[in-house]
């Protein structure tokens, strides 16, 4: 139910195949969208003829010589002859954990990309900065530039990246950038919301410190 999964499902649907999209979280594109936006996307996906199951996940694949069914965590079994796995980015923190470095969703780093050990740096998809793990190329390159400068003795700070994503396969354009909208519930951000249900429009702008 993330970007890759939705794009793959839409591509397969063009061949008139029966598609079931299984998402482990409680909504589609949970890393980018709030509940309201995800519900609108859910409707668009179903209108394309795709079945959607949320808050569940694959437990096992069954079949002889080829897959015949998928067993889900909920106990359901889905008949299948093709399975596409689009799990996205999951940082491997095993080495950092064994080394005693602080970890969260990824290896925690400060503004200089240093880990809990100041002589060890982490960048890219394994690093967690200010609670965020970036799964895109551009933030990884920005982190690399900062880490290289610090290692070379040049003062530099990483202040986070604008993590923008756009879904291009649905009739309704979906775009998200910046902080996750759920963070407004913590009080760190305020939000301005525009809704036009008749036309399927929903916009949410997060703001902090008056901007």
Predicted stretch roles:
Residues 22, 71, 109, 206-209:
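Hydrophobic alpha-helical segments, especially N-terminal targeting/anchoring helices
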Residues 5-60, 140, 158-173:
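Rossmann-like dinucleotide-binding cores of NAD(P)H-dependent redox enzymes
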Residues 63-71, 76-149:
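FAD-site-proximal beta/loop scaffold in flavoenzymes
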Residues 2-5, 148:
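Catalytic nucleophile loop
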Residues 1, 24, 125:
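Cofactor-binding loop segments of dinucleotide-utilizing enzymes, especially the Rossmann-like FAD-
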Residues 126-211:
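Mid-to-C-terminal Rossmann-like scaffold of FAD/NAD(P)H-dependent oxidoreductases
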Residues 5, 28, 61, 93, ...:
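Flexible, glycine-rich phosphate/dinucleotide-binding loops
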Residues 60, 112, 204:
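Short, surface-exposed charged micro-motifs
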